[in-house]
Amino acid sequence: MVRRGLLGWISRVVILLVLLCCAISVLYMLACTPKGDQEQLGLPRANGPTGKDGYQAVLQEREEQHRNYVNSLKRQIAQLKDELQARSEQFRSGQDQASDATSLRSGWDREPKAQADLLAFLRGQVDKAEVHAGVKLATEYAAVPFDSFTLQKVYQLETGLTRHPEEKPVRKDKRDELVEAIESALESLNSPVESSPHQRPYTAADFIEGIYRTERDKGTLYELTFKGDHKHEFQRLVLFRPFGPIMKVKKEKLNLANTLINVIVPLARRVDKFRHFMQNFREMCIQQDGRVHLTVVYFGKEEMNEVKGILENTSKAANFRNFTFIQLNGEFSRGKGLDVGARFWKGSNVLLFFCDVDIYFTSEFLNTCRLNTQPGKKVFYPVLFSQYNPGVIYGHHDAVPPLGQQLVIKKETGFWRDFGFGMTCQYRSDFINIGGFDLDIKGWGGEDVHLYRKYLHSNLIVVRTPVRGLFHLWHEKHCMDELTPEQYKMCMQSKAMNEASHGQLGMLVFRHEIEAHLRKQKQKASSKKT
């Protein structure tokens, strides 16, 4: 922007030179134009009383006048050239200053317009980025996901074969970037201009979590959440770094005390899985959170009484009445179950969490669900951490550890399920307005991607980020013959991904070679002893 301001300034100098040259040309033409009739009458005639000598004297006088005038013009042109050269040197010096950050800052002080142009450019970057409104995207692969972070860890999708899904930032620039974002947020929260005199000071200990993503042609967006002054209150700051100074976009106070979540679970049989699900639901939703409604949509009548019995026992033991049981006939359809459960709600606009029976979530995730949704503006598509087969992971142990010890985010224990879009938080009004699920899809897979694409094609912001409190528990996957070829392929890919990590699968493939090597080593050791 500084360069553009200097270009505008030099263009004005060039225009000034052109005008001066035009003025000089006009003066020259006026000077060279023959005089009027009265002056022509004063010229001596060749046959007049003064004769030829008088005429030559007049010509010599006129020639001397023109010579003096031309010399004057040459001096003015030389002066203009010197001024133009000086201005050009200043322009080149300005270009050099533009590459030096310190000189640039001092240049802002000297050039208020250049500084204003720079600020206008940076704010234009904010408007172009997906900050205030969603951008229509062609496919699910065009969406830019967020990464999430706390004070100690970063939870990232792109790991390759060397990085980890959860890790401390090793690179200094990444650490400094996130630290600067938190410090900028704290500075804003503690600013005397924006806070009340009696407000407590905020510190890094109040920081809960943040998400960020980079649009490579615009900048990096940060959404940081801090503890509020009261229970269920939070402070959220949205910051944007447009490849330059970080800028605060907005500051808002959020009160989530009355934000109810309707957890909708479609189900057919799988009583044991549902029993484990309700144990987690009772601890996280009833005992810890207390702002949750449960909707179970059950297909068929086989084992239905067992499922209803689990619900009734939980209701009596925990004094929990906020649940709905819906029974549907016909074959299982996840999309239909979720659609019916969402439309069955008769209260005010409610936040929906589409969940499966083999999902484990924490109470912290429920707040993350609330923080990343907004009716008419944002929907939340978390990337959950999918557990590998415990029988493979802990095959060399004496016993498989309890579930609580298995749910750790490591490369050896699971992976970010970035190809799954089934677990989602969105307001009922947005779900209805977007058209809900495609009810023509039967069986496993496809309905979640279809709904996700609808939101990508809309003007709503789709928040896509890995979360540390949402886990997919491993279970053996059966791909039925009734599935279409595309569904069957998706099912088999999911089955392969669920078993173990790249290294662990390699150990299984080469286990015979490893065992043979160990036998040889054992034989060598025994032969040396003898």
From Swiss-Prot:
Keywords: Coiled coil, Glycoprotein, Golgi apparatus, Membrane, Metal-binding, Signal-anchor, Transferase, Transmembrane, Transmembrane helix. Its EC number is 2.4.1.174. Disruption phenotype: Deficient mice are viable and fertile, but decreased body weight and length and abnormal cartilage. Residues 34-530 are lumenal. InterPro entries: Chond_GalNAc, CS_glycosyltransferase, Nucleotide-diphossugar_trans. One of its GO terms (biological process) is UDP-N-acetylgalactosamine metabolic process. Signal peptide: none annotated. Residues 88-107 are annotated as: Disordered. GO terms for molecular function: acetylgalactosaminyltransferase activity; glucuronosyl-N-acetylgalactosaminyl-proteoglycan 4-beta-N-acetylgalactosaminyltransferase activity; glucuronosyltransferase activity; glucuronylgalactosylproteoglycan 4-beta-N-acetylgalactosaminyltransferase activity; metal ion binding; peptidoglycan glycosyltransferase activity. Residues 91-105 have a biased composition (Polar residues). Pfam families: CHGN (PF05679). Residues 57-93 form a coiled coil. GO terms for cellular component: Golgi apparatus; Golgi cisterna membrane. Residues 1-12 are cytoplasmic. It catalyses: 3-O-(beta-D-GlcA-(1->3)-beta-D-Gal-(1->3)-beta-D-Gal-(1->4)-beta-D-Xyl)-L-seryl-[protein] + UDP-N-acetyl-alpha-D-galactosamine = 3-O-(beta-D-GalNAc-(1->4)-beta-D-GlcA-(1->3)-beta-D-Gal-(1->3)-beta-D-Gal-(1->4)-beta-D-Xyl)-L-seryl-[protein] + UDP + H(+). The chain crosses the membrane at residues 13-33. Transfers 1,4-N-acetylgalactosamine (GalNAc) from UDP-GalNAc to the non-reducing end of glucuronic acid (GlcUA). Required for addition of the first GalNAc to the core tetrasaccharide linker and for elongation of chondroitin chains. Important role in chondroitin chain biosynthesis in cartilage formation, and subsequent endochondral ossification. Moreover, is involved in the metabolism of aggrecan. Belongs to the chondroitin N-acetylgalactosaminyltransferase family. This is Chondroitin sulfate N-acetylgalactosaminyltransferase 1. It comes from Mus musculus (Mouse). The lineage of its organism: Eukaryota, Metazoa, Chordata, Craniata, Vertebrata.
